[in-house]
């Protein structure tokens, strides 16, 4: 089942989510528009198993990264009609 990983602009570039992910779904990418110079990205969401360790590790308390599991993806992201 496919999961969506959404990185929000409240990401502080701390790398905690990247280090917490057991399957390397996340990585840090350069971003000039951020004071840390980097932001989390999720290029390999097809490998996400939905463990949500990235959410738990985030020091912004789920404000920067969210994992939407399978069926809840469109509903939770506000995409359902």
UniProtKB/Swiss-Prot annotation:
EC annotation from Swiss-Prot or TrEMBL: 1.97.1.12
Stored SUPFAM superfamilies: 4Fe-4S ferredoxins
Residue ranges of every copy of the 4Fe-4S ferredoxin-type domain listed in the record: 2-31, 39-68
Reaction(s) catalysed (UniProt annotation): reduced [plastocyanin] + hnu + oxidized [2Fe-2S]-[ferredoxin] = oxidized [plastocyanin] + reduced [2Fe-2S]-[ferredoxin]
Main location: membrane
Keyword list, A-Z: 4Fe-4S, Electron transport, Iron, Iron-sulfur, Membrane, Metal-binding, Oxidoreductase, Photosynthesis, Photosystem I, Repeat, Thylakoid, Transport
Superkingdom of origin organism: Bacteria
UniProt GO molecular function: 4 iron, 4 sulfur cluster binding; electron transfer activity; metal ion binding; oxidoreductase activity
Protein topology in the membrane: Peripheral membrane protein
GO cellular component annotations of the record: photosystem I; plasma membrane-derived thylakoid membrane
GO BP annotations, alphabetical order: photosynthetic electron transport in photosystem I
Compartments reported by the entry: Cellular thylakoid membrane
Sites where the protein binds [4Fe-4S] cluster 1: 11, 14, 17, 58
Necessary cofactors: [4Fe-4S] cluster
Cofactor note: Binds 2 [4Fe-4S] clusters. Cluster 2 is most probably the spectroscopically characterized electron acceptor FA and cluster 1 is most probably FB.
Enzyme class: oxidoreductase
One Pfam family of this chain: Fer4_7
Binding site residues for [4Fe-4S] cluster 2: 21, 48, 51, 54
UniProt xrefs under Gene3D superfamilies: 3.30.70.20
Subunit: The cyanobacterial PSI reaction center is composed of one copy each of PsaA,B,C,D,E,F,I,J,K,L,M and X, and forms trimeric complexes.
Function comment: Apoprotein for the two 4Fe-4S centers FA and FB of photosystem I (PSI); essential for photochemical activity. FB is the terminal electron acceptor of PSI, donating electrons to ferredoxin. The C-terminus interacts with PsaA/B/D and helps assemble the protein into the PSI complex. Required for binding of PsaD and PsaE to PSI. PSI is a plastocyanin/cytochrome c6-ferredoxin oxidoreductase, converting photonic excitation into a charge separation, which transfers an electron from the donor P700 chlorophyll pair to the spectroscopically characterized acceptors A0, A1, FX, FA and FB in turn.
The protein's name: Photosystem I iron-sulfur center
Protein encoded by which gene: psaC
């Amino acid at each position: 089942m496919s999961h969506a990983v959404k990185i929000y602009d409240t990401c502080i570039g701390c790398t905690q989510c990247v280090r917490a992910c057991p399957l390397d779904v996340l990585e840090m990418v350069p971003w000039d528009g951020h004071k840390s110079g980097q932001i989390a990205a999720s290029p390999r969401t097809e490998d996400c198993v939905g463990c949500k360790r990235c959410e738990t590790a985030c020091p912004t308390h789920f404000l920067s990264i969210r994992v939407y599991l399978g069926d809840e993806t469109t509903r939770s992201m506000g995409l359902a009609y």
